[in-house]
Amino acid sequence: MVAPVRPNSTKMYLRDKWIFIPTGTYSPTAPSTALLIGATALDVSKMFFQSSARPSQSTNLAKSPKRIGDGETYEFVGETSVSIGEVRYSFNPQGVALSNEVKAYEKFVPGTTGFLVNRLGIDRDTDLTTGQFVTSYPCECGPQLEVPEGDAEGAEIAIVQTFAQTGPKSIKVALLA
């Protein structure tokens, strides 16, 4: 008999890095570290609020048709719907062009396409390096709206914006140079 295996836990807290890179030379099946740390990429790990949507999926379960003699019915895995949803990020309506306070707002012009790239399991402040693994989500940015984020005295001005997942994700792909 094979003994059960219990993998070690991987902490999530402060180990969730998100980078946006516009459509262009980036390849989700051969992700380039140089592109992800380059001038066209934007690390949004500390711009997106915790309330932002994360990529998700929902898979339908279809039931087999019952036959006259069946006492049971069974399920099939059906269609899967993938989405990202509404992200919320910091914004200063009085911010100077190209400043940190408006970088996400300027980068995510409605209609912009690119990839949200996620690295998990390593401190978010640690730089990306060759050999680390990332998951890439192709996406398109929807319209932007100024909204409050938080409550009462602690509220901040934010932008809420829908991101659509436009293709299949690439999970756990090693970063290349």
Regions found by a protein language model. Name each.
Residues T29, L35-L36, A164-A177:
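Compositionally biased, intrinsically disordered linkers/stalks adjacent to structured regions
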Residues E101-F108, A158-V160, L175-A177:
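Short intrinsically disordered coil segments
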Residues V2-R88, C141-I157:
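Solvent-exposed edge beta-strands and adjacent loop segments
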Residues P65-D127:
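Structured, beta-strand-rich domain cores
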Residues I19, M47-F48, T73-E75, K107, ...:
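Intrinsic disorder/low-structure terminal segments
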Residues L120-K169:
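Short beta-strand and beta-hairpin "edge-sheet" elements
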Residues K11, S32-T33, T113, V117, ...:
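Generic N-terminal initiation segments characterized by hydrophobic and/or small/turn-forming residues
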